[in-house]
């Protein structure tokens, strides 16, 4: 086929760090591109070019998008897209593997070329004529410049009315510049992206409410502007803002070199901290990675003038090696939850194994597997069939899961166990469908089970006017009976460790959109009170309206109590967790204080303060002894690998672990980073096995006393031996008689205090051991309060 195509224009450049050689294996030789370009460009084997219109962008209509493996394992694009999968063969060369119609797998270190169902003739023709096995070349500009005019500089409500109602006076899709005269911080919320600029160079990325440096400023974006910043900013980018508010971001070889230097400094600082604080880390691996990084950076400097593209490649590799050194310098806990939410899609056993292998590589120890969604179960359900509904989600009815038959849940439970991953059932509760999928299966035979909004005069099942979701009517006794049967079936037939309940209340709406107005629920309330709730109005009947909404809330709480009692009657160790979203649902979590074992508050932000604020606000609502994990959205928001690691470290602080949302958006680099860093070693899950987790931590402290603290002079040898004996006695006692462990824990803590007072134990080590013991003591208390037959 003739290849006579012209280049189309675009102003979108490549995103940072990943396009040419990140993670490149040593067998790939570096090649310098001979063609100079101003924008990111794909060149086919015949020499024809096509300019790339964006990187890692889901909006792919009428433009050519390049996806790399920093985005996810899949492109997540819509079916009907036209995509070409490219496998890496050299520094900037790729081999055409095959073509797909959307949501393509992204090869590790490879690319996917993508355009939407609606596209230009030029892009369509270029992709059509690419042949399997053909070599294509990615041409990158050595210097990348992007420019965008800010909506406001140092805004006020008066100067930026569009941003007046919002934190930091930053409105939707706006780009704002903040100078020190604005204040100490930008005062923005977590729903955006910010770059900190010092002396004209980007020194910090991400987050909200950033501190404004005295020697620079912060550029902050929301929505479209946030995407512009993330696509064009790296540590080391050069930034200028002119008198008209035009923000210019420049990336060049020096920018990437600066990024590498900063990464090396960060890693060295972390390594020094590990040494000074006697932390248990992979120091030898960290040292090797730092040496490799510095060698690559020197090579980049050598060829910077003669081969700038090769220099760019070396600096990227140097940055990656420095990142690895940082990850290796982080401690890895012996006991904590490392959980991942996941909606399964696999129709083969090989697909299940691939997902679980990747989860294991990251270091996860628990899968919160979505076992019910869109009104179906993922496993063959006799309860569903009994009530006249399909026995399994149609996607999995013809699945082939080897010895597990068509049972996807069984495959996940058993294959997960082989890899050290337990399964907790994540359920969509009373949300049973969405409008785009049509009437949910439950309402085809049981239309009277539908939850009805006040403004629904038809009485027929209709989706929520806001979310477009369909809801079962939680206040109806028959509906509760059905749902309890589903959860009982799941718990009895599968070795799941717990149930993560979601959507266990009516949607929270104002008067006209409020729920609870089905014929059956209205009749039930009228029978008990003599009042038809549809006649009530909070404006004219405030007390009666409050009585009505309280009655509905009691019905919701009664169901959760029944579910708790049913689960604990089957298995006292079975874990009930809730995941409240910020807002009314988070506040109401205290209603379930006697029925919930663990709470996973959802922290949408990506900085330590916002994550911790979410956790601490939730803890105020629940009794001491409740198991707490932190839910974070690092994968879902497509943070880079370092962002994922930072989020995990922030989220673990003050809790017993982390839940990440969601593995469908995970990326290979982030999985690799977690597996090298904070989740390098296997960890016991304290919510599922609190006593075993406690014993594991005690044994680990014993090992660290011998291998690190005494060896490196942080603890007197004789006193170290005595402390180990105390820990051994405690370990044995916990196994035999956990009910009376407070005294033993406190005795060892006092022993540690005495050692610190006598300068026979370094303060930093003693405080860390005390913190570990306090956490472990809490796990024992959790076991007694939540897993004991008397509770």
Predicted regions, residues:
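Sec-dependent signal peptide cleavage junction
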Residues: 19-34
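Active-site-adjacent "subsite" loops/lids of carbohydrate-active enzymes
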Residues: 334-340, 406, 424-493
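Aromatic-lined carbohydrate-binding/catalytic grooves of carbohydrate-active enzymes
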Residues: 362-404
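Aromatic-lined carbohydrate-recognition surfaces of secreted/lumenal glycan-active proteins
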Residues: 422-429, 434, 500-508, 538-587, ...
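Aromatic- and acidic-residue-enriched segments that line the glycan-binding/catalytic groove
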Residues: 379-392, 431-464, 503-537
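Aromatic- and acid-rich polysaccharide-binding/catalytic face
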Residues: 497, 502, 531-543, 585-611, ...
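Substrate-binding cleft of secreted/luminal carbohydrate-active enzymes
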Residues: 236, 596, 600-784
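Catalytic domains of carbohydrate-active enzymes, especially glycoside hydrolases
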Residues: 352-380, 493-497, 599, 657
């Amino acid at each position: 086929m003739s290849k006579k195509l012209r280049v189309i224009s675009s102003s979108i450049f490549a995103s940072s760090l990943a396009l040419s050689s990140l993670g490149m294996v040593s067998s790939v030789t570096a090649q310098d591109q001979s063609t100079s370009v101003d924008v990111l460009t794909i060149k086919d084997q015949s020499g024809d070019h096509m300019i790339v219109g964006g990187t890692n962008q889901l909006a792919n209509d009428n433009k050519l998008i390049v996806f790399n493996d920093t985005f996810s394992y899949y492109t997540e694009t819509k079916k009907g897209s036209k995509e070409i999968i490219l496998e890496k063969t050299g520094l900037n060369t790729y081999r055409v593997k095959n073509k797909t119609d959307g949501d393509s797998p992204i090869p590790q270190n490879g690319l996917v070329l993508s355009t939407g169902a609606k596209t230009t003739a030029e892009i369509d023709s270029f992709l059509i004529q690419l042949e399997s096995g053909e070599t294509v070349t990615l041409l990158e500009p050595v210097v990348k410049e992007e420019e965008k005019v800010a909506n406001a500089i140092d805004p006020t409500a008066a100067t930026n009315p569009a941003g007046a109602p919002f934190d930091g006076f930053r409105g939707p899709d706006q780009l704002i510049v903040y100078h020190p005269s604005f204040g100490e911080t930008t005062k923005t919320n977590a729903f955006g992206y910010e770059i900190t600029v010092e002396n004209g160079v980007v020194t910090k990325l991400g987050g909200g409410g950033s501190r404004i440096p005295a020697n620079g400023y912060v550029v902050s974006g929301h929505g479209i502007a946030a995407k512009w910043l993330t696509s064009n900013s790296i540590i080391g980018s050069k930034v200028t803002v002119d008198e008209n508010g035009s923000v210019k971001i420049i990336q060049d070889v020096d920018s990437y070199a600066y990024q590498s230097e900063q990464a090396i400094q960060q890693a060295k600082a972390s390594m020094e901290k590990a040494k000074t604080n006697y932390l248990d880390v992979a120091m030898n691996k960290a040292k090797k990675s730092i040496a490799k990084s510095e060698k690559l950076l020197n090579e980049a400097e050598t060829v910077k003038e003669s081969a700038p593209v090769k220099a760019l490649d070396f600096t990227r590799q140097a940055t990656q090696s420095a990142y690895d050194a940082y990850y290796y310098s982080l401690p890895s806990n012996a006991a904590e939850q490392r959980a991942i939410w996941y909606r399964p899609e696999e129709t083969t056993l090989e697909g299940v194994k691939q997902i679980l292998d990747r989860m294991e590589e990251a270091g996860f120890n628990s899968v919160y597997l979505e076992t019910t969604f869109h009104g179906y179960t993922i496993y063959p359900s006799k309860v569903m069939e009994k009530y006249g509904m399909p026995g399994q989600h149609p996607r999995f009815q013809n699945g082939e899961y080897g010895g597990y038959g068509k049972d996807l849940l069984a495959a996940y439970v058993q294959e997960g166990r082989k890899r050290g991953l337990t399964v907790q059932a994540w359920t969509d509760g009373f949300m049973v469908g969405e409008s785009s999928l049509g009437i949910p299966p439950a309402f085809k035979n049981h239309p009277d089970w539908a939850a009805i909004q006040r403004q629904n005069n038809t009485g027929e099942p209709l989706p929520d006017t806001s979310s477009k979701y369909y809801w079962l009517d939680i206040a109806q006794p028959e509906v509760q009976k059905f749902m309890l049967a589903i959860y009982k079936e799941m718990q009895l037939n599968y070795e799941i460790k717990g149930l993560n309940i979601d959507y266990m209340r009516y949607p929270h709406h104002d008067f006209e959109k409020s729920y609870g107005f089905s014929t059956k629920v209205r009749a039930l309330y009228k029978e008990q009170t003599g009042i038809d709730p549809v006649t009530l109005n909070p404006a004219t009947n405030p007390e009666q309206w409050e009585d009505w909404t309280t009655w509905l809330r009691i019905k919701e709480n009664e169901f959760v109590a029944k579910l708790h009692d049913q689960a604990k009657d089957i298995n006292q160790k079975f874990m009930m967790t809730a995941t409240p979203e910020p807002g009314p649902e988070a506040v109401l979590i205290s209603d379930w204080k006697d029925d919930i074992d663990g709470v996973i508050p959802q922290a949408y932000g990506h900085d330590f303060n916002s994550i911790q604020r979410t956790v601490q606000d939730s803890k105020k609502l629940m009794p001491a002894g409740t198991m707490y994990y932190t839910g974070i959205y690092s994968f879902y928001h497509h943070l880079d690998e370092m962002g994922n690691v930072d989020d995990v470290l922030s989220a673990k602080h003050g809790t017993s672990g982390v839940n990440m949302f969601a593995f469908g958006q995970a990326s290979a680099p982030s999985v690799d980073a977690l597996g090298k860093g904070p989740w390098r070693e296997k960890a016991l899950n304290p919510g599922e096995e609190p006593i075993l987790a406690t014993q594991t931590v005690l044994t680990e402290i014993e090992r660290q006393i011998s291998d690190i603290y005494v060896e490196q002079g942080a603890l007197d040898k004789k006193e170290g031996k005595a402390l180990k004996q105390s820990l051994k006695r405690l370990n044995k006692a916990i196994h035999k008689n956990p009910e009376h462990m407070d005294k033993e824990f406190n005795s060892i803590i006092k022993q540690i205090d005495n050692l610190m007072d006598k300068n026979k134990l370094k303060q930093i080590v003693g405080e860390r051991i005390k913190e570990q013991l306090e956490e472990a003591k809490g796990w024992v208390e959790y076991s007694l309060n939540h897993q004991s037959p008397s509770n």
